[in-house]
Amino acid sequence: MINPNPKRSDEPVFWGLFGAGGMWGAIIAPVMVLLVGILLPLGLFPGDALSYERVLAFAQSFIGRAFLFLMIVLPLWCGLHRMHHAMHDLKIHVPSGKWVFYGLAAILTVVTAIGILTI
């Protein structure tokens, strides 16, 4: 018999953030590591392409703030979601694990938003 009043799950929201963070971490983050972590220190950028003034101006624009926010928050949600499910798979039961991991991700998201807005 089908339950006429099924309990709604909040899991699709967290899986969505997990998937978005995973895609961001697989596509965008490696490019940023290559550009900023390898090519920039080796001096392979033309002229002042990534000078302090240009990077600061980008970081203070709306697009730059959104990019920095997503660069921090999406992989954070992905990692904490993965940790939550890894603990479950390893049969390590954290009391109120969903609240611990997703709560920490939410708190760090707010901290990141405050940090990004004060640049």
UniProtKB/Swiss-Prot annotation:
The chain crosses the membrane at residues 25-45, 55-75, 99-119. It holds the Pfam family Fumarate_red_D. Coiled coil: none annotated. InterPro entries: Fumarate_red_D, SQR/QFR_C/D. It is found in: Cell inner membrane. GO terms for cellular component: fumarate reductase complex; plasma membrane. The keyword Lyase does not apply. GO terms for molecular function: succinate dehydrogenase activity. Keywords: Cell inner membrane, Cell membrane, Membrane, Transmembrane, Transmembrane helix. It is a multi-pass membrane protein. Two distinct, membrane-bound, FAD-containing enzymes are responsible for the catalysis of fumarate and succinate interconversion; fumarate reductase is used in anaerobic growth, and succinate dehydrogenase is used in aerobic growth. Anchors the catalytic components of the fumarate reductase complex to the cell inner membrane, binds quinones. Belongs to the FrdD family. Part of an enzyme complex containing four subunits: a flavoprotein (FrdA), an iron-sulfur protein (FrdB), and two hydrophobic anchor proteins (FrdC and FrdD). This is Fumarate reductase subunit D. It comes from Citrobacter koseri (strain ATCC BAA-895 / CDC 4225-83 / SGSC4696).
